[in-house]
Structures are given as C-alpha cells and as structure tokens.
Amino acid sequence: MYIRFILFLFFISSCDFPERNCLKFQTGTFEFKSISEKGDTLITKFTRTKDLEIGFFNEKIDSNTVKWVSDCECIYKKVNPKSLSEKKAVQMKILSTNANSYTFEYSFVGDIKNKQRGFVKKISD
C-alpha cells in the first residue's frame, strides 16, 4: 500500500502543467500579432488597466471595458459600439504564461463552438 502511494505521488509530481501566472498580465502594455488573409503581419498594441483596455490598430483607437471574473479570465465590452455585432461581449481566457507573454483563447460570450487562440507579448508594465 505504501509503495502505491509513493508511485502515485511520483506520477502526480511528474505531470507538467502549464504555468499560469495570470495576475501579472492583467495590466500593462501589450502587442498582439496576427496574419491577414493576404499574408501580411498585422500588429495591434494595447494598454490594459484593471477595468479598461485601449487598443491601437491601423491608426485607429478602440476601447473596451474589462471585467475580470477570475485571475485568468475576463469579459470585454466595447465602450462605444457602432453595430449590433460590436455590442456582443467577448470572453478571454489566459491558457498559459511565461516570462513576458501568454497564450489565450477568446470568443463571443456563450459561443463555445467558435473559440480562437492567440499569443500576446507584454511590452511594459
């Protein structure tokens, strides 16, 4: 019985769980890169406080309220939506972190079939 317990502890301790130090990524200035349909690299920079995110893309500014529902998950709502689709809230969940970046998934709230993933690099605090 004692041997089984030791083996169980060894098995559990050898599992490699992804690092999730989400609190350090709730605020700061970040950079998000994506690829357009034409193959161009698109760069979005954004600054996030505990309750507001301001993004800069193609010389346009976009603002969202941020509500953290856990250390690693938040809900975004556009400050001044101009269309029905912009009124939809977006759910974002940090999946893993490392020293200065994180991997995340996002979708409209309640839309579990259309989740997408991304990678963000933290530029400054």
Where are these regions (language model features)?
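A short, structured loop/turn motif at beta-sheet edges
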Residues: 65-73, 94-101, 122-125
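Sec-dependent signal peptide recognition
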Residues: 1-8
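Tryptophan-anchored aromatic micro-motifs
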Residues: 22-38
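Short, exposed beta-strand-loop hairpins at the edges of beta-sheets
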Residues: 55, 103-117
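C-terminal motif of bacterial Sec signal peptides marking the signal peptidase cleavage site
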Residues: 11-14
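An anionic, turn-rich surface loop/hairpin at beta-sheet edges
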Residues: 75-99
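N-terminal glycine/threonine-rich, aromatic-flanked beta-hairpin/loop signature
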Residues: 40-69
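Bacterial signal peptide processing site
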Residues: 16-18
